[in-house]
């Protein structure tokens, strides 16, 4: 299984070699790593409230408040109507409640719950003889479930979930669509409620909605609900959700932006995990279309498509090769070089870093795709969040690359930006840059030993000229033990010549390369 970022440095703590296991260099996404899930998605799209079919709420805010107050004054009347035995009165009053719950801002969800009508609405869901009443009750409950977790819990506790699932086979299009929406809101509340809905068998019933007769509004709602069934941490059981893959494989060929967006988000959730999940996503036949969507004009589609491609290349070399073979790399070059926003460039760099963590053939393909120059440009000039991912991409290439590949990286100017990041506040990135520089120094040393450079490690000189030597010296006083030890090791290996050691020192005062390193006070200084 691929290691997460914090495990990667741990695994490498005691090993300093150029060729590392590709699995070790790959990084699954951390929850907080990429801020692509914008507030808008978090706040608005996990739950959706259905507003009025005609936007009658055109009042100014103060007028709207007084209008609402007047509406609430009629609550006792509406409650009585809902609990009456008169079907037409039940419908009329349920519709009024639904309208109250559909106002644009701050609908009175709490007041409606307190009025005690929720169990009655759940009863109305069973009225197969009166689809219009079912529809209005389902709409009202959908909007109650769009509120807080407590609001959602009320809807669940009155036994609505199995009834909503049964309504997915209603002969009424409107009732089915409203049931889909309600289940999406309930599942979108939390992993706990998502699993409750899935546990009642909702997925199979939901997947049945994706048929040739489905209206676009149903496709949009059902795809959104499907994405909520797949999202959240802890993740749903893959055994439950993988049945969605064939449907998602069809949905990503839609021309509708909303359907595409939510289908790609669902795939991004399903591909976020172990290699068996990644393999199932690959076998759903989605890779070719995902690469096409990396060129989509809408960021709302591009972002989850890129997220999914990025997840797939956290897999093993064979899985990563699938994305390479589908020509993902030219699309990634485009994302690095064109005018895309920070979060997209960052995600693209993260994706590339997991490809450069692959084998030497894959590193060569990255080089031949022309990715290194734009990567180095971002490493030097981009915002820090992008620089961090670019540093991983370059460092991983130095870890797995051969002699000529690493020389090519140096020829593209990677040394100075790696040196510049040695003073960044993120200790993991400092370590990543030190590892990259160390791998480069090893190649310089090999060239020196071959007699190609007149007895000089040319890359050590370049690091010195880039003010890297001074920065590495300063890292000897770093709080992080791994950074401090690695800095000492690099200095000792590539800059400490015999003539620099005072003759008066006894041999046993320093034990370089052993388990213990005894340092002079203040560390080494070669300035």
Curated annotation (Swiss-Prot):
> Is Nucleotide-binding included in the keywords of this UniProt record?
no
Domain IBB stretches: 1-58
Gene3D superfamilies in alphabetical order: Importin-alpha, importin-beta-binding domain (1.20.5.690), Leucine-rich Repeat Variant (1.25.10.10)
Work out whether the entry's keyword set contains Signal: no
Annotated InterPro entries: ARM-like, ARM-type_fold, Arm_3, Armadillo, Importin-a_IBB, Importin-a_IBB_sf, Importin_alpha
Keywords, A to Z, come to:
Cytoplasm, Protein transport, Repeat, Transport
A Gene Ontology cellular component where this protein is annotated is: cytoplasm
Residue ranges of the ARM repeats are: 109-151, 152-196, 197-234, 235-279, 280-319, 320-362, 363-403, 404-445
Q: Which SMART domains match?
A: ARM
Q: State how it assembles.
A: Forms a complex with importin subunit beta-1.
So what family is this one in? Belongs to the importin alpha family.
Q: Its function?
A: Binds specifically and directly to substrates containing either a simple or bipartite NLS motif. Promotes docking of import substrates to the nuclear envelope. Seems to act as a cytosolic receptor for both simple and bipartite NLS motifs.
By what name is this protein known? Importin subunit alpha
Organism per entry: Solanum lycopersicum (Tomato)
């Amino acid at each position: 299984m691929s290691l997460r970022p914090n495990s990667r440095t741990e695994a490498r703590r005691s090993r300093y070699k150029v060729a590392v296991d590709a699995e070790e260099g790959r990084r699954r996404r951390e929850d907080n790593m990429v801020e692509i899930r914008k507030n808008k998605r978090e706040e608005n799209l996990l739950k959706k409230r259905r507003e009025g079919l005609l936007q009658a709420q055109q009042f100014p805010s103060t007028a709207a408040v007084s209008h609402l107050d007047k509406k609430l004054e009629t609550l006792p009347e509406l409650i009585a109507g809902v609990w009456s035995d008169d079907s037409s009165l039940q419908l009329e009053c349920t519709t009024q409640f639904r309208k109250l719950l559909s106002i644009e801002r701050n609908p009175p969800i709490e007041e409606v719950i307190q009025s005690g009508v929720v169990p009655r609405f759940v009863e109305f869901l069973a009225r197969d003889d009166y689809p219009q009443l079912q529809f209005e009750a389902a709409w009202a409950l959908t909007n109650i479930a769009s509120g807080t977790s407590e609001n959602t819990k009320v809807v669940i506790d009155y036994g609505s979930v199995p009834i909503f699932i049964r309504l997915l086979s209603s002969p009424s299009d409107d009732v089915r669509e409203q049931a889909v929406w309600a289940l999406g809101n309930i599942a979108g509340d939390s992993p706990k409620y998502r699993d409750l809905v899935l546990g009642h068998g909702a997925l199979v019933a939901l997947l049945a909605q994706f048929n040739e007769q489905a209206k676009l509004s149903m496709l949009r709602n059902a795809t959104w609900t499907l994405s909520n069934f797949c999202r959240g941490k802890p993740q749903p059981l893959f055994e439950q959700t993988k049945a969605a893959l064939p449907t998602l494989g069809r949905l990503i060929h839609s021309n509708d932006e909303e359907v595409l967006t939510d289908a790609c988000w669902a795939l991004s959730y399903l591909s976020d995990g172990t290699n068996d999940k990644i393999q199932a996503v690959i076998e759903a036949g989605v890779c070719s279309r995902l690469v096409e969507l990396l060129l989509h004009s809408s960021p709302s589609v591009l972002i989850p498509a890129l997220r999914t491609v990025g997840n797939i290349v956290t897999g093993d070399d064979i899985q990563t090769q699938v994305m390479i073979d589908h020509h993902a790399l030219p699309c990634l070059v485009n994302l690095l070089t064109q005018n895309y926003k920070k979060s997209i460039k960052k995600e693209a760099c993260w994706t590339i870093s997991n490809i450069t963590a692959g084998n030497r053939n894959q590193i060569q393909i990255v080089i031949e795709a022309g990715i290194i120059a734009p990567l180095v440009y971002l490493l030097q000039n981009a915002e820090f969040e992008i620089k961090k991912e670019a540093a991983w991409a370059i460092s991983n290439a130095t870890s797995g690359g051969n002699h000529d590949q690493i020389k090519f990286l140096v020829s593209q100017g990677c040394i100075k930006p790696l040196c510049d990041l040695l003073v960044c506040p993120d200790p993991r990135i400092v370590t990543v840059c030190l590892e990259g520089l160390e791998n480069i120094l090893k190649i310089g040393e090999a060239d020196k030993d071959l007699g190609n450079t007149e007895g000089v490690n040319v890359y050590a000189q370049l690091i010195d000229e880039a003010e890297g030597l001074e920065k590495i010296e300063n890292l000897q006083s770093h709080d992080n033990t791994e950074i401090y030890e690695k800095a000492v090791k690099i200095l000792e290996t590539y800059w400490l010549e015999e003539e620099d050691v005072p003759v008066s020192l006894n041999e046993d005062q320093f034990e370089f390369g052993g388990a213990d390193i005894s340092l002079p006070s203040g560390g080494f200084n070669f300035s």
